[in-house]
Amino acid sequence: MTRPMTEALIDSHDAALFDLDGVVYLGSEVVPAAPATMSRLRANGVGVGFVTNNAARATTVVADQLTDMGIPAAPSDVVSSAEAVTALVATEMGQGTRVLIAATSNVDDLARKRGLVPVHGADEHPQAVIQGYDPEIEWSRLEEAAFAVQAGARWYASN
């Protein structure tokens, strides 16, 4: 992109949202141009935000990682799929909805903050199941989630 094209692109937007893994960083390594790009955008008055489909990590953890990589970020600058799915369930089904969480404790914490009521088994009659990435999930939890969906609970999936 030529310099005039880049300036025109920056000047025509109030905000820019960036996916994280593969765009801002690769695993634990920052993409070399990312810190300077974010700085330049911010210096030109463009709001910078980050989106991730990683439901396993809290936005505080992600913001700390970005800051450590030379990209200052606050938790409010980061939106995760866990936040999106818990907000969706709370909006569609309302506070007080019983949800079976088949994901990391991050999703459980966000569900509670949104007024949802996490339960642990299909026998507690959850009205919804929220499934998300959890590298340590046990088959018994997936089984309970499947039983709940089979019994009529709405199934919400996140990465």
Question: How should these model regions be labeled?
Answer:
Residues 1-20, 24-159:
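HAD-like aspartate-dependent phosphatase fold
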